[in-house]
Amino acid sequence: MARSGRNAPPSGISGADAPSKLHTLIDDFCEHLDLVVGRSAATIRGYRSDLYAMADTIEDIDNFSLPTLRQWLGIAVDEGKSRATLARRTASVKAFSSWAQKNGHLKADEAARLISPKITRDLPKILGEQQAGDFVENAASTNEEEFLRDSAILELLYATGMRVAELCGIDLSDIDYDRKMVRVLGKGNKERVVPFGESAHKALRNWLDVRDEMTEDPKALFVGVRGQRINARQVRRIVDRAAKVTGVDHLSPHSLRHTAATHLLDGGADLRQVQELLGHSSMQTTQIYTHVSNKRLLEAFNKAHPRA
C-alpha cells in the first residue's frame, strides 16, 4: 500500500484552485520515492514540502532552470533559513531534477550544478559506559508490565543501536532468542539482522512473560497501554522518563544509537561492521563516530597519562 502517493494533502500549494503541471510532477516524483525507492513516509513528506515551496515560487515546469532555482534559494537566504534547511532543499530539488530529466519531463538536469551549502555536523551526545548502564536500568514506569516493557526497549535500543522506527516495527517473529539476533527493517525497506547481548535477552524474556496481559496483538513485539503497536512518540517518552531518573539532560532515543556506535568502536569494532549494524548506506555517515571515539580517546589520554 502506498504511504504517500499523489493523494496526500497538497499543503504546499497556494493560490490556484488546481495544481500546476509542476505540482503534479512533484506528486509523481513522491509516488516514485514511495513505490520504487521505498523511502519512508516522513522522508517523502520532507521532499514534498521542499518541492512545493519551490513550485510556489517557480510556478511552472517551463520556468524550472538553474537561474530560477538559484533565485528561489536566494529568497530562502534572505528569509534567514539555516544552512541545514538550504542544504536539504538543494538536495530535494537536485533529486527531483534528476528524476524529471531521466523521465523526459526536462530536456536537461537543470539542478545538477546547484551547489549545496556546507554544514558543520555537531558531534552527537554520547553517554559514558557507566552512564549508559545506569540509564538502561532506570525505566521509570511504576506499573509492572510497563516497567518490564520499558526496560526491554531501553536495553534493545542501546544493545543494537537501531532507530526508533525500526524498534517500533519489530514483530515477535523477528526475534531469534537462541542466537540472540533481531531482524530489522530499516530505511528503504532494507532488511538486516542485528545481534544483542545477554542483558537485552533477559529484559526481552521478562517482557514476554507479561506482554499478553497488555495486548491481544498477535504480531507486535512492543505495545502501548491500549494494546496497539507502540509508536515513536511513546518510545521518546520512555527515554525521557529514564533520562530524568538518571539525571541526564537532553537525551533522545537517537542518542542511544550514537552511544551504541561509539562504544562499539571504543571496544575495537571495525568501522565497516558498525556501518552494517547501524544500517548506514554510506560509510561517511558512520565515520562521524570515529571522530567521537577519537575525541574520547584523547580526553582519556590527557586525563590519565603522566606525560600528557
Curated annotation (Swiss-Prot):
SUPFAM superfamilies: DNA breaking-rejoining enzymes (SSF56349), lambda integrase-like, N-terminal domain (SSF47823)
InterPro entries with a match to the protein in the record: CB (IPR044068), DNA_brk_join_enz (IPR011010), Integrase-like_cat_sf (IPR013762), Integrase_catalytic (IPR002104), Integrase_recombinase_N (IPR010998), Integrase_SAM-like_N (IPR004107), Tyrosine_recombinase_XerC/XerD (IPR023009), Tyrosine_recombinase_XerCD (IPR050090)
Residue ranges of every copy of the Tyr recombinase domain listed in the record: 122-302
Any one of the GO BP annotations: chromosome segregation
Ribonucleoprotein as UniProt keyword: no
Keyword DNA-binding appears in the UniProt entry: yes
GO molecular function: DNA binding; tyrosine-based site-specific recombinase activity
Top-rank taxon, per record: Bacteria
Compartments (UniProt record): Cytoplasm
Location of the Core-binding (CB) domain: 20-101
Quaternary context: Forms a cyclic heterotetrameric complex composed of two molecules of XerC and two molecules of XerD.
Family: Belongs to the 'phage' integrase family. XerC subfamily.
Function noted in UniProt: Site-specific tyrosine recombinase, which acts by catalyzing the cutting and rejoining of the recombining DNA molecules. The XerC-XerD complex is essential to convert dimers of the bacterial chromosome into monomers to permit their segregation at cell division. It also contributes to the segregational stability of plasmids.
PANTHER family linked to this entry: PHAGE INTEGRASE-RELATED, TYROSINE RECOMBINASE XERC
Protein name: Tyrosine recombinase XerC
Native species: Corynebacterium glutamicum (strain ATCC 13032 / DSM 20300 / JCM 1318 / BCRC 11384 / CCUG 27702 / LMG 3730 / NBRC 12168 / NCIMB 10025 / NRRL B-2784 / 534)
Gene: xerC
